[in-house]
Amino acid sequence: MAHYKKFRLSTLAAVVGIVLAVGPENSYAEAPIQFNTRFLDVKDDASLDLSRFSRKGYIMPGSYHLQVLVNQSQIAQDNVITYSVDNNDPDNTYPCLSPELVSLLGLKPEIADKMIWINAGQCLQPDQLEGMETQTDLSQSTLTVIIPQAYLEYSDEEWDPPSRWDEGIPGVLFDYNVNSQWRHAEHDDGDEYDISGNGTVGANLGAWRLRADWQANYRHENDSEDKDNFGSSSEQNWDWNRYYAWRAIPQLRAQLTLGEGSLESDIFDGFNYVGGSLITDDQMLPPNLRGYAPDISGVARTNAKVTVTQRGRVIYESQVPAGPFRIQDINETVSGDLHVKIEEQSGQVQEYDVSTASIPFLTRPGQVRYKLAAGRPQDWDHNMEGGFFTSAEASWGIANGWSLYGGAIGEQDYQALALGLGRDLALLGAFSVDVTHSRATLPEGSAYGDGTIQGNSFRASYAKDFDDIDSRLTFAGYRFSEENYMTMDEFIDTHNDDNDRQRTGHDKEMYTLTYSQNFSAINVNAYINYTHRTYWNQPNQDSYNLTLSHYFDVGEVRGISLSVNGFRNEYDNERDDGVYVSLSIPWGNNRTLSYNGSFSDDNNSNQVGYYERIDDRNNYQINAGRADNGATLDGYYRYQASYADIDVSANYQEGDYTSGGLNIQGGATLTAKGGALHRTSVNGGSRLLVDVGDEANVPISGYSTPVYTNAFGKAVIVDVNDYYRNQVKIDITQLPEDAEAILSIAQATLTEGAIGYRRMEVLSGKKAMGSIRLRDGGTPPFGAEVYNSRQQQLGIVGEDGSVYLIGINPGERLQVTWEGKTQCEAALPDPLPGDLFSGLLLPCIGDASSPEATQPEEKPLLQLHTQRRTFSTQPEALSSRYPTH
């Protein structure tokens, strides 16, 4: 008998499985499929409800929760799509594509303007465009709109047209980066404490991003030898260094910014001002047309804090372990000179300047890029300086390979005009040249001089990729300035000087050379960065960084790395030279043995180290060795929590000092949809709030280490790229055994600074066999569906009311639906019995006309990317999800 029952089950499953396996079909039905219900060998074939399977591609009239895709690219995560009967063919239905949904399709403007609407303008008339069709897959809960590419705006694999950009939801945010360092000097038994931080407070209102940047510092020194004054001194400060707001203007491919800021320019030197700007945003362009960001490299002899500032404002701060470092995530909008400060835990400090001179200024033929600004200059303390100014610059792709660019900036007593030409030389690389002329009327008695002075500044840039030899040469930003040439920043300074002040740091000549080479035949990489600066009234400065890396194998040990790094930094009449040598040997899975040698004029050290990556979140390194002053010991530990990135470091130098450091970088985001503590990538930048209902500890991954939802089922993903098609997903390999991801993948293309929101779905609970009985003793028809209170489908009723249920919880109420509406409700026992596969008897109360039974406005179905698991006990009833093997 048991064998016969299993045979009947397999027959039922095969019939329904064949229908579901047909795949997505056009919403316009083809010839109906006739079912012979006697073939199913069911006692009461009149009770079967197979209407949803009877026509190939037919969708029953009603409303459904569906994912919407255009040519396989997701554009809407959870839309309510209404299917209506086609007046021209009563046997067919069509989906109502609303104006809001059609605006996301990415149609060219001239195509979208000609669309015809029906149902009082609420639905797109079907069959308007040749080749356009819709496909609905209820088993995957998706609606795919197929549109020929000729009707669509440009897009690529990771970039969407502006019509699909997401401005996000309203919310507030607080991002922070806090560094703490402690140092104990053995020679005087003194202690130093330093806590510094920076971050952003903000709010999003529609397309507007409101932001305020802050930075703070607290320093305390305790000298035990100064008994009378308790040997202590402290200093502290807190600054709100910038208040500003911005929004994207998609129609112009530009960003409008109001408030305080620094002049963004590819031609002129920057300065602080308050006002407004309208700037073409390269991030809004497809990825292959975007610009360049500065690259900062250096060497830390010990665990150190690296701070990058521009005109006093901190734009980057982080702790780095001993050895060479390279910072490549500076915002590409930063322009001008940057100041780098490396504070070693040993107490030593390195300082130097780097230039963000860009590669040759080229624009695609027919395109125009521009930057407009107006306002009043101001100092660090928000005080106005000088008069009202305006600034404008543009680059025009005049012909294939040629770009003309220039700009002007001025106020009442200062004007500057620039003109340049860029050329793509194809196989010979690319170059640009420009000249800037300045004219300034100086105030009487200025230390910079009297009267009107004029001067010129000349600049040239060159870049070349040598693909045949896998190398790149960039001669970026050669610049020569005449003695009387004056920047706007220098002119502003003339209004604040005193009679004893002299003009310092007056640039004469500067150039930066960067070269990288990969010698693949011998597994060697070379990188050179050299900067030379001369001044009219102070000594020259030179800095260079040379790195050679070699990768090789020895016997069964593979991936050995040998690196030599030489550097020189000159700043404020001081020179710092050094060589750093490192050898890294893999030692099993995720473990490495290393040797590090640091050699300079004032100190030499040799260390051996051990590194281990414990898991995706934890790694540490321990080093021990000897320096000129004695033994050394240091360690570094990093933990990537869901709520913050945490770095801990410690150093010991025999007879000299003991030190430690702590860095915490994180943020908090709060919206009407919920909020969470989280890691941060860029202060005040874009983020994606993921909502999985009330499920805690659900792993969500973007492009880096996964984060886990908090107690409220929320997580914030910060590793998202502006104007890219980002994808996040639930890591199903880390889900508990009683959890199943129903909606596990989401996509979003966010504008800069947006707080995106996506709902994902996890079904948690026990699995059980049940038997549903109606009030009159009968059973629901075959094919009836069972939902929970969150409208998640838990199972499909088989013969005799049997149903295999997943995701059930004690005391939960279940809704049983057929014929397009909820017919009755059943309650699960609390607590659930120990043996859930013996068959739960579930009385179903109510009928179509009773108060307990209500017709749902929408019909949630199986969601996109349903994940399935294999169960040890196979159900003997038709399930809404088939276990995989």
Regions found by a protein language model. Name each.
Residues A2-L9, V15, S27-R290, D602-T669, ...:
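Post-signal-peptide, soluble extracytosolic/periplasmic N-terminal scaffold domains
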Residues S84, T705-K714, Q791-S802:
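Short, acidic Ser/Thr/Gly-rich low-complexity loop/linker segments typical of extracellular
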Residues S163-K227, V368-T441, E612-N618, A624-N629, ...:
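Conserved, compact domain cores that house catalytic/ligand-binding motifs in diverse enzymes
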Residues W165, I195-A207, G231-P250, G386-N400, ...:
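Feature captures outer-membrane beta-barrel proteins of Gram-negative bacteria and organelles
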Residues T142-I147, P360-R364, S744-G765, P829-L864:
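Extracellular beta-sheet/turn segments enriched in Thr/Pro/Gly and aliphatic residues
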Residues N88-L97, I330-S335, G713-P736, E740, ...:
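Short Pro-Gly-centered beta-turn/loop motif in secreted/extracellular proteins
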Residues M60-Y83, D694-S704, D776-R790:
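Short, ordered, surface-exposed loop/turn motifs in non-cytosolic proteins
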Residues V68, G298, L688-V692, K766-R775:
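A short, amphipathic beta-strand motif
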